[in-house]
Amino acid sequence: YKVRLYDITNGIDQAQNIGDTESFISTTGLSPMTSIGIVDNSDIDIYLLAGNKIVKYTTKGMEQSESPARIFAYGLSYDETEDGYTINFNLNEDATSVNLILNNPETGEAVQTIALGALPKGANQTTISRADLPAEKLNWSIQAIAGNVTKFTKISDDSPLYQYYAPYGVAIDKSPESDYFGRIYITNTAAGTVSAGNPSQAQTSTVGVYVLGADISDITQQGSTAYSGTISWSGETGMGPRKAAVASDGRVFLCDASTNNAGIYLMNPETFDISSIFTGATNSNGSLMIGGKYVCGQITAVGIRGEGATTQLYAIDKTASGSSWKKFINVYNIGESNTWTTAPNESKAASSYVGNDNSSIVPVSTGYWAAQYRGGGSNSPANPCMFYYSDQYQDAVFNTAEPNIIGESSQNGALAVNEKEQLIALSVNGGVAVYSYKMKEGIPSVTEKFRKEIAEMGGYVNDFEFDYAGNLYAVSNAGERLAVWAMPTSDNSCVTPAKKSLVLNNIYTGIENAVSISRISPNPTTGIITISAQNTIETVEIYNIAGSLVMRQAHVGTTTTSLDLSDLAGGMYFVKVNDGKAVKVIKK
């Protein structure tokens, strides 16, 4: 008697036999039999009952092959010549195969897929000639494929770039249209030297924001000093900058829960300047007022959704209700603006609401998810560990107390939502609980998938975040760490589209990225230059004669812009618009 295992990824009607267990039961004649399997994260126990005999098969304690990270491509760009293009991209993991996909720019439909084979982690490139392009203009994307992630796999370590003394927030730029796609932002609320876990190279952290590349590199060369702007952060653990959210255009919003610095701040992802979005506000004991109107209070968490003019900023406000226990959710239809000078578009608490300061909010396309720290046995309909607010019903329509699916502590209210895969990560009982959900008539049905203790987090997690591929990031003040795990998947593939401005043309126009510089004046110059282009300018870069980038202007959005070269030494420089051809300019 044996148990036969089938792969039903493609449905029971297309089940594939993947193997049989060894036979440990034999009887004379046929006997009644049954089997059952119990899955625990990446392990499985299989029980076989035949006649009056039973046998258990298990994978626990057995060495299993290492799982890769969930893979994706980032840093997509190209170099153009008269004959064609060199396509550049980076991979966060070794790929078993990579495809260059050419898309119709109008419909998004794939026109051609070009196999690039297996490629290593890191920088890669391929070439394509104009003659091989099947249409006059094409968008393109990179599909990366790697081996399955068979279990919840830690892919971080204890090196200095994972160490932070008092981290409270982690946010990732997940918009391929952003100039900063893939960047990871960690907020650190207090200064000190990391000691948790006894690291061999202990990192000393300052108060502010740390920025990592998608490959966990110090992409901005900031070293151990956080970006803090000109804000006098309190330096008190958990106050500010507390948590972060990244808009689709790369803007980084930060919140502060202290009395003196209450509110929401904007960090420029190019210059790392930080300023309050509430220009001209007066602070009265943690309440911000502009023109006699309440605009914001002490904020424990922020989230963001939408893009462009439809961008909405969500904030958990511990001041607005007048009661520190019952917190309001403020909604600001901020769009493309960097400031806000009036009352929130919405400010209220739902029937299930946030009561604890240790909380999170994740807006999705149909509403928002929120979570908070609740002690063991304290999960209730009014103050649940987690709830979902529906835009359709204008109230909370799900909470973890009805039915009660969490009996343990949800310290410290860390939450991440992968809307594409309908997955939730919630801090539970010193680790993570992962749930799947399905929407029916606007109401989610939530099912626990697995739980995993995370000992290195020191007993609780302060914030979770999924990256573009679905890897899970976590920060813990107690554990003094950023940690990263690959989420289990049987389809470890991801398509990253290039920016829409990076159009491939089968006819050489001499205009790279569909933008050429029409005029730079005055040239030569003693200071300010004005650049005019035929189409919309997204970025302007200035290089010195050695090829080093000395100035950059991003998110221009017009056909004309000005830059001040007064601080540059006299000499020859090169101006590039949208990574196009360089034009010489002389600085006197």
For every predicted segment, state its role.
Residues 83-87, 527-529:
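Structural beta-strand segments of beta-rich domains
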Residues 60-78, 485, 489-521, 527, ...:
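Residue-level detector of functionally pivotal "anchor" positions at catalytic/ligand-binding pockets or at interdomain
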Residues 1, 45-48, 177-187, 251-255, ...:
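Conserved beta-propeller blade signature
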Residues 13-25, 152-159, 208-235, 273-291, ...:
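Beta-propeller fold detector
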Residues 29-38, 164-173, 232-245, 284-305, ...:
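Repeated scaffold domains used in trafficking and secretory/extracellular systems
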Residues 97-119, 133-144, 510-588:
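C-terminal outer-membrane/trafficking sorting elements
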Residues 33-66, 458-508:
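Blade-level signature of beta-propeller repeat domains, shared across WD40, Kelch, NHL, RCC1
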Residues 1, 53-55, 190-195, 258-261, ...:
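Short glycine/acidic-enriched loop and turn motifs that connect beta-strands
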